Amino acid sequence: MGLTSQLLPPLFFLLACAGNFVHGHKCDITLQEIIKTLNSLTEQKTLCTELTVTDIFAASKNTTEKETFCRAATVLRQFYSHHEKDTRCLGATAQQFHRHKQLIRFLKRLDRNLWGLAGLNSCPVKEANQSTLENFLERLKTIMREKYSKCSS
């Protein structure tokens, strides 16, 4: 029994340290993947990037970081669900079609990663202001880069 009580404090310490290491490491990996995906998305010019989405960043003063990530994921999900088979986005050429499919795949990946960071089940999105998908992604990229710089320091 004496041995068990002596081992408990070091075991709790190791458990706490391992949890912090894993959390910080996950933060870096997830943010790196999000930023990489956003870089790819913002470099692409497709027929759909000029379409409008709800601008969740317009009035985000009283919004937590998790709510922002959740709302961004919701907006992306609404967009790719609605425009995945949109003939305006598919284009007339094989190259336009391929770019659109790649855009949708990247948006789905981004959605999944944002939901993981948010850790919320659902969040409301008010459709007051609009911006283009391109501008939305640029603003999200800026936010993610800021978060990454804080996370890695």
Swiss-Prot record:
<dbReference type="GO" id="GO:0045893">
    <property type="term" value="P:positive regulation of DNA-templated transcription"/>
</dbReference>
<dbReference type="GO" id="GO:0150076">
    <property type="term" value="P:neuroinflammatory response"/>
</dbReference>
<dbReference type="GO" id="GO:0005615">
    <property type="term" value="C:extracellular space"/>
</dbReference>
<dbReference type="GO" id="GO:0032736">
    <property type="term" value="P:positive regulation of interleukin-13 production"/>
</dbReference>
<protein>
    <recommendedName>
        <fullName>Interleukin-4</fullName>
    </recommendedName>
</protein>
<dbReference type="InterPro" id="IPR018096">
    <property type="entry name" value="IL-4/IL-13_CS"/>
</dbReference>
<keyword id="KW-0339">Growth factor</keyword>
<dbReference type="GO" id="GO:0030183">
    <property type="term" value="P:B cell differentiation"/>
</dbReference>
<dbReference type="GO" id="GO:0006955">
    <property type="term" value="P:immune response"/>
</dbReference>
<dbReference type="GO" id="GO:0032733">
    <property type="term" value="P:positive regulation of interleukin-10 production"/>
</dbReference>
<dbReference type="InterPro" id="IPR002354">
    <property type="entry name" value="IL-4"/>
</dbReference>
<keyword id="KW-0202">Cytokine</keyword>
<comment type="subunit">
    <text>Interacts with IL4R. Interacts with IL13RA1.</text>
</comment>
<keyword id="KW-1015">Disulfide bond</keyword>
<dbReference type="GO" id="GO:0043066">
    <property type="term" value="P:negative regulation of apoptotic process"/>
</dbReference>
<dbReference type="GO" id="GO:0120162">
    <property type="term" value="P:positive regulation of cold-induced thermogenesis"/>
</dbReference>
<dbReference type="GO" id="GO:0042116">
    <property type="term" value="P:macrophage activation"/>
</dbReference>
<dbReference type="GO" id="GO:0042110">
    <property type="term" value="P:T cell activation"/>
</dbReference>
<dbReference type="InterPro" id="IPR009079">
    <property type="entry name" value="4_helix_cytokine-like_core"/>
</dbReference>
<dbReference type="GO" id="GO:0097028">
    <property type="term" value="P:dendritic cell differentiation"/>
</dbReference>
<dbReference type="GO" id="GO:0050728">
    <property type="term" value="P:negative regulation of inflammatory response"/>
</dbReference>
<dbReference type="GO" id="GO:0005136">
    <property type="term" value="F:interleukin-4 receptor binding"/>
</dbReference>
<dbReference type="GO" id="GO:0045944">
    <property type="term" value="P:positive regulation of transcription by RNA polymerase II"/>
</dbReference>
<dbReference type="GO" id="GO:1903660">
    <property type="term" value="P:negative regulation of complement-dependent cytotoxicity"/>
</dbReference>
<keyword id="KW-0075">B-cell activation</keyword>
<dbReference type="GO" id="GO:0008284">
    <property type="term" value="P:positive regulation of cell population proliferation"/>
</dbReference>
<dbReference type="GO" id="GO:0045582">
    <property type="term" value="P:positive regulation of T cell differentiation"/>
</dbReference>
<dbReference type="GO" id="GO:0007259">
    <property type="term" value="P:cell surface receptor signaling pathway via JAK-STAT"/>
</dbReference>
<dbReference type="GO" id="GO:2000352">
    <property type="term" value="P:negative regulation of endothelial cell apoptotic process"/>
</dbReference>
<dbReference type="GO" id="GO:0010628">
    <property type="term" value="P:positive regulation of gene expression"/>
</dbReference>
<dbReference type="GO" id="GO:0045671">
    <property type="term" value="P:negative regulation of osteoclast differentiation"/>
</dbReference>
<dbReference type="GO" id="GO:0042092">
    <property type="term" value="P:type 2 immune response"/>
</dbReference>
<dbReference type="GO" id="GO:0016239">
    <property type="term" value="P:positive regulation of macroautophagy"/>
</dbReference>
<dbReference type="InterPro" id="IPR001325">
    <property type="entry name" value="IL-4/IL-13"/>
</dbReference>
<dbReference type="GO" id="GO:0045892">
    <property type="term" value="P:negative regulation of DNA-templated transcription"/>
</dbReference>
<dbReference type="GO" id="GO:0005576">
    <property type="term" value="C:extracellular region"/>
</dbReference>
<feature type="signal peptide">
    <location>
        <begin position="1"/>
        <end position="24"/>
    </location>
</feature>
<dbReference type="GO" id="GO:2001171">
    <property type="term" value="P:positive regulation of ATP biosynthetic process"/>
</dbReference>
<dbReference type="GO" id="GO:0048260">
    <property type="term" value="P:positive regulation of receptor-mediated endocytosis"/>
</dbReference>
<dbReference type="GO" id="GO:0032720">
    <property type="term" value="P:negative regulation of tumor necrosis factor production"/>
</dbReference>
<dbReference type="GO" id="GO:2000553">
    <property type="term" value="P:positive regulation of T-helper 2 cell cytokine production"/>
</dbReference>
<dbReference type="GO" id="GO:0030890">
    <property type="term" value="P:positive regulation of B cell proliferation"/>
</dbReference>
